[in-house]
Amino acid sequence: EKLHLPEAMLYEPNTILALEYLRSLGKLQKQGQPVPKPWAVRRQGAGHGDTLPKGKFASGTTLRQMTANSPDKNSLKKDLEPLVPPAVCQAIVSCTSYPDKAKIYQLLRYKLLSTAPQGLQQILGISEGLEQAMLQAINFPSYDEFVHHLTSRRYPSTRIQRLISHLLLSMNKELVEKMDNAGPLYLRVLAMDSTGRQLLRQIKNRGRLPLLNKVTSLVNRRDLLHPEAMNLAQQMLSMDIAATNLRSLALGETASLYEDYLHSPCYIEN
């Protein structure tokens, strides 16, 4: 009210994200740690959920729809070139496949059918009878219709889609709370350039958290068979591995499972 902003703006995903950043900065400041000064940057062009480009700006939703619906790579490249940097355009066009919402929806329906309501209530973010609403919505024929049916002011579509990920990954409220309270227990290296490699050496020598170049240094395939014996750091990483497997299942027949065990960090030439 003091800023004379429309109330609906407070419920937009980027606003929520900004507020969480401010909250985290406030916590760090109370601990006496130096924090950067936050800056509010006005969004230009397309809004977060817009489905059409505005000028030279497009939302992530628009880019995903263009990628999914384009008839061929040449058409996709032509559509993307005015909207994204050349390197991003090349990366999108060169990608061979993307997760299929229809496949995700079939996994979701089975998960809902095979989990008791009491079990659903233990999933992060599911409360206030939402599990019953989800069970009633599984007869909708598509992922988008399922999400649309559950969407409300309290549960925007982006939140519903996050809850779907939580459910498919069996993200237990109690376990996630333990992870949140513990904070990061390792640093996983995904990519680096020559400068990053030097920085990683310093982190390895001075930092308090272990660096993971390969997941096997913390969790091997045998460990995954005995989740009850895992420590908290291993449980964190196993959830990461499960997320990669979920994406592979959504890609279809050509994707390999357990890709986290197949790839080393990417080295980028300067």
Where are the predicted features?
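Active-site cores that bind ATP or allylic diphosphates and position pyrophosphate for catalysis
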Residues: 1-270
